[in-house]
Amino acid sequence: MSAVAEITVTPVLVADLFVEGGRMPVYAHLVDHPDARVLVDTGLTQLHPLVADLDPRPYPLDTQDLDLESIDIVVNTHLHFDHCGGNRLFPGTPIHVQRTELEDALNQDGHTIREWVDAPGLTYVPVDGEFELLPGVRLLPTPGHTRGSQVVVIDNGGRPSVIGGDVAVWFGELEEAATEGLRIVHALDPELVWLAHQHEPWRPRAPR
């Protein structure tokens, strides 16, 4: 795949949750590409009884300094509630998600908040496996967190960057690479990996 040097990634804080005695951030990631503007995951915009125990504090995208109409493409790394709750803000915008993930979200009890996935006017683009979204930007299946999880791989020349969603929640999981998805990410030899629940990207340790 050819590199496109002008691709940038900007994290956008969209919520925080109460997890293991503290507040955990939830990030979406904005990809500015010469050909399109891509939003990876959409956070959440409202509360729901199914996740009340996590005490969510949403920072909805439509209340932030972000022009929603400037978004050309949405990607869901997976369809858990904190990654798809803002999908409803993008009716008619193509939303790329792995087909297996969409099927599980719509058919399996307990996978997500189904009405947030199946909101009116949404246009899903089911993806089967690896997919080139734009020059220098591809979607790559990374089963583990869910069987239909995917990451976004960005080639700016040299080692790639990865927007990982929940391929890992903690940096230590990336070090261990215990799931198929994490092993796939490691095989990319990435320069950095943006995670949905960390303020800063993970960078592999320099060899000793």
Positions of PLM-derived features:
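Zn-dependent metallo-beta-lactamase
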Residues: 1-39, 44-48, 178-189, 203-208
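Metallo-beta-lactamase
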Residues: 2-3, 45-46, 51, 59-82, 97-141, 176-191, ...
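Core dinuclear metal-dependent hydrolase active-site scaffold
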Residues: 11-16, 26-32, 38, 128-157
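Pre-active-site segment of Zn-dependent metallo-hydrolases
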Residues: 19-21, 36-73
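Short, conserved loop/helix-junction motifs that constitute active-site signature segments
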Residues: 88-91, 187-188
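Short hydrophobic/aromatic-enriched beta-strand-loop microsegments
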Residues: 94-99, 162-165
